[in-house]
C-alpha cells in the first residue's frame, strides 16, 4: 500500500515491525524500523531507493500495483547499503536497462553487493541536476561519511522535499508516516538513540554538510528520510537538533556503567552514585549493569553525559569482557568533550582498573582519578567510594554547586580546622587508598590526629604495601 507524501510523491516502502537487530547485532531496534522508498510521478517517473533485501519480492510486487515497472524512467540510489538498495537485483531483473543515478562510490558498493557491473550507472556529484518534467528537477548533494562514503541526498524542486538518506532518520516503525502523527516522546528518543549510536563518529562532518545544503538557499517543506518518519511539521526542527548534537553535546548528566563477578563492583557503583548526588543534587545520575542492560541505551546515555564512570571486576588480571567490548564501542564512536573515571574491585590482583583507565584515555576521554577496592568493600571502603563520588561531582560540575552543599563543605572544613590543623589527606598514587590524619592508621600504630608530616618514614600503604613516597596530596585539597 502506498501513501501520498505530497502531490505526486508516494511512499512505497516497507515497515518491519519485528526486526530487533541492525548492523548484525550492534544496534537493537526495539521499536522496529522502516525502509522508505519513494515514487515520484511527473513527466518522468523516478524511484528513490528500494528496501531491505529480505523484502525484495514483496517490494517489487507492491511496486507493480502502483506503476508498470517499464514506466520507471530513473532509479536514484542515495545509499548502497542493503537496507536501502537491497531489492535492486529483484527489480533490475524486470527492467535491466533503467538508468541508475548514484555517486561514484555507490557504484563500487552496489557492484560489491549485487555483482552486476553491466547495469546502466550514471554518476552524479554535488550540484548536478536531473530534469523530470513539469518544471521540476532533482538536485543531488554528496554527503560522504554520513554515514558511508557513497551517501548522498536528493532534493526535489517545486515540492521542496529533501530525500535525506540516513540523516534525520530513526529506527522507528509506526502505521503513521508523518512526524506530527506519532508519539513525540518516542520519536525524540529514537532520533537521539539513532544519532548517538550511528552518526556520533561523524559529528565533525554534520555541521559543515548541513551548512553546505543550507547554502543552496532552497526551501525545505518536507524531509523524507530512509528510516522512520517523514518530517512535514516544522521539518527543520530535526536539523536544529543535529546541529546541537554535533557540537560536542553534553547534558548535566553522569553515567555509571559496570560489570561485576561477586556484586562488589556494584556496591562501589551505588556508593559512588550516592556521593555524586549528595554533593550535586542537580546532576542526573544513571547506573547500568552492562551485562543486563541495552547496550545502545548505555551508549546514548554516555552521549548525553558530561562524564562516565566505568567499573569492572578483575578477571585473569584484565577487565570483564563485556566492559572491554563496551569500551571498544565507545572508542569507535569517538565521543568528545567528556570525562571518565575507572573503578573496580579485585582480590589478589587489581590489573583491570589500570587497563581500563588506559583504554578510556585512548578512547579520547579526559581522565579523572581511578578507584580500587579489595575484596568486598566494607563500610570504610564504601565511604571512600562515596567520597570519590563527591570529588567527581566537584571536578565535573558544569556550574557552581548549590549553596547548601557548599555551606556543608565549608562547615565541615571549619569544624575540622577548629579541632586541629592536621593538614591534608594523602592519597596513594598506585591504589588510591587515602590517609586521613583525623583517623590515622591504628594497624601501624599511627594514632588519630597524626598529620602526614609526622607519620613514620617506614609507613606502608595498607592496600598495596608501598611507602610514603608514592603518596600525593588528595587532589580536592591541593591548593
Swiss-Prot record:
Pathway where this protein functions: Nitrogen metabolism; nitric oxide reduction
SUPFAM superfamilies linked to this entry: Flavoproteins (SSF52218), Metallo-hydrolase/oxidoreductase (SSF56281), Rubredoxin-like (SSF57802)
UniProt-listed PROSITE patterns: FLAVODOXIN_LIKE (PS50902), RUBREDOXIN_LIKE (PS50903)
Keyword DNA repair belongs to the record: no
GO terms for MF: electron transfer activity; FMN binding; iron ion binding; nitric oxide reductase activity
Record: residues binding Fe cation 2: 83, 166, 227
Binding annotation for FMN: 260-264, 342-369
Chief subcellular location: cytoplasm
Cofactor(s) annotated in UniProt: Fe cation; FMN
Domain (Flavodoxin-like): residue spans on this chain: 254-393
Assigned keywords, A-Z: Cytoplasm, Electron transport, Flavoprotein, FMN, Iron, Metal-binding, Oxidoreductase, Transport
Binding site for Fe cation 1: 79, 81, 147, 166
UniProt-annotated location(s): Cytoplasm
GO cellular component, one term: cytoplasm
Source organism superkingdom: Bacteria
SMART domains for this protein: Lactamase_B (SM00849)
Residues in Rubredoxin-like domain copies: 423-474
Residues at which Fe cation 3 binds: 428, 431, 461, 464
Residue span of region Zinc metallo-hydrolase: 30-210
Tagged with keyword Mitochondrion: no
Pfam families: Flavodoxin_1 (PF00258), ODP (PF19583), Rubredoxin (PF00301)
NCBIfam families xrefs: PRK05452.1
Function statement: Anaerobic nitric oxide reductase; uses NADH to detoxify nitric oxide (NO), protecting several 4Fe-4S NO-sensitive enzymes. Has at least 2 reductase partners, only one of which (NorW, flavorubredoxin reductase) has been identified. NO probably binds to the di-iron center; electrons enter from the NorW at rubredoxin and are transferred sequentially to the FMN center and the di-iron center. Also able to function as an aerobic oxygen reductase.
Family as reported in the entry's similarity comment: In the N-terminal section; belongs to the zinc metallo-hydrolase group 3 family.
Protein name as it appears in the record: Anaerobic nitric oxide reductase flavorubredoxin
